[in-house]
Amino acid sequence: MAEYKIECEQFLGISHSGGVYANGESTVELTDEEVTTLVQLIRQKGTTDVDKIDLETTHPQLYAKLDKAYHDMARHAEYMHWLWEGYDNGYYEYDDDELMEYCERECGFFFEYDENDYLDANGDFDEEEMGYAKSKAFHEWLDDYLRGLSDDDVVKFMGEHMDAAVDVDDVEYTVSIPEDIIQKAKEQA
């Protein structure tokens, strides 16, 4: 068994700035026999088009394996796209102070300040101004923190602490033959 890289680019619609796409990348695990079958079909039919080589009919289990891998990859790519879209556009409603406190306790957020930087015209400490600065620093930190997490950890964090939820039902995708297998077919020709 070997893993083969697969990729997708999905058109999700049009926004005011043009087309919206989600890109995905994953792997599919195939046996040597399955790889040989794909290579032979490509060489016999002279095409890499899954429909034209009639893979779904002639080798339904192999097709089902590729179909599942492409479906799961496409679904994940679309899910992550909309999850980040919601975050970037402020769609999720959560208690800012509660999240900040959690991140101070559990995630390493720390706001260090000098009281002299937050004095009002009378020389008194301006707690409100310091609060704004802390909130701004937190959101910058949070953005960096989230973008540094794995997809699974982002999904978990946003779901548990930001009430983020995305519904991805019907995913459009195309089943293809992994590029490395296509290259093998060309090399052996």
Language model features: what each stretch is:
Residues 14-177:
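Acidic, low-complexity, intrinsically disordered interaction modules
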Residues 1-31, 183-189:
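Short, extreme N-terminal segment that most often corresponds to the first beta-strand
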